[in-house]
């Protein structure tokens, strides 16, 4: 094969992948030539996946992912993920009852690193963590979350609705609804609202309203008091939220 053709194969592949996703997803998602999106990704609309970002999973309406990120997650609506996000779903045996850290003693999956040889005759340790192993989904991130830049999340962790993760945090366990977490490892340092307001917001599940309703009532989202009054009246009247 001509060397010039070989040299351009990666670029041609990137072009074909870009065009395929444009055809498949239409205007639902904005992305770039350097973005890598798996063929099984699902987008609800008004989405963005940043430059040089690799994404597998589903992205709820109005959610976006920044540049230079590695994301494998089921993500809710109206969630913002900053640049430099990554996950770690691999783990290693290093505590009791295991004696050695070498995968030669507990793993069959590592055989490819050892010329097809391993001392272990069966798999003794679960080396990868998933939120949903059957679907290959590593993490779950709720609706109305904000995740700062350069955050790392361990496989299997769920970030629940309304949570905030501060920049450079390393998240090793589930984050409660509307919690603000930061640090390495990440710890709860506060909450966005008081307990009563959090319970109220979770009850409304406002992110499941129709897009038409959200557009018409956008001003409510700039005033928590007006928002509460509106939904309190609805609850008092036993009215159900219209689902999209």
Question: Could you say what each language-model-derived stretch is?
Answer:
Residues 1-144, 150-151, 177, 186, ...:
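Domain-scale signature associated with acetyltransferase and cell-envelope carbohydrate enzymes
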Residues 147, 164:
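Amphipathic helical hotspot of TIR/SEFIR-family domains
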Residues 153-163, 169-172:
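Beta-rich strand-turn-strand
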Residues 168, 194:
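ATP/adenylate-binding site constellation spanning eukaryotic-like Ser/Thr protein kinases
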Residues 169, 173, 177-179, 187:
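Glycine-centered loop/turn positions within well-structured domains
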Residues 190:
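Gly/Ser/Thr-rich active-site loops/lids in small-molecule metabolic enzymes
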